[in-house]
Amino acid sequence: MGMSGHGMPAARWGAGTLLVLGALVGCSGGDGKPSAHAGASSTAAGPTKGPGDYRPPTALCPKVDFGPLTAAVAPTSGAPKGELTGSDPSTSSGAACLQAFRTTGTKADGRSTVYCSAWKDVPTAIKVYAYRLSSAPKEAQGAVVKESGLGVEAFRYQNVKDAAPFADDLRLVVRDSNMECEVQVQSLKPLTDQQVEAAWPAMAVTVRTLLPELRS
């Protein structure tokens, strides 16, 4: 299984990273401490059977609040852009929303992206999440950290696999029932330690406030 929960390689957006970067450049513009090291298996609480509580999202941008990430990382650049995701609607279907940001100057040099996919049932979502959790250490710089109190289960890490041309690539993956959401913060310029430390709880808040919107 070489696919992420949102039905596409996690670093891709539309036609590919380079095209996105071209679009970005053309625009103007918790405490974050480790709670535990991620293991190879998932120890999920909550229901493990049934179709789940979520239907596939179709328009994600109107539901995502990028305010916490804007305050933590950098000002936004331009309007958010959305698209549908999922290579097989009979298995998984979802949506994504990208918000460009600028750490310096007037040109966009980074992006915050939220992906959310509803899997066909809870067992499938659990299986995909467990696979992603077990694979994360191969992609991570430093520890893969499990997050408590966020959906049914969640983890975060700093990605280095296929991260180029980004200098920093922060990722948070959350499963709640049959829904999987991922927040990515990717910057062409290195983020400061302060920005990274502030980004983790902001990413968590983004998902925490989004999940109830996806249930409605």
Identify the function of each model-found stretch:
Residues 2-3, 216:
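Short, intrinsically disordered, low-complexity terminal/loop segments
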Residues 31-216:
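A small/polar (G/S/T-enriched), proline-flanked helix-loop surface module common
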Residues 24-31:
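Bacterial signal peptide processing site
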Residues 16-24:
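Bacterial N-terminal signal peptides
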Residues 3-17:
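Bacterial N-terminal signal peptides that target proteins for export
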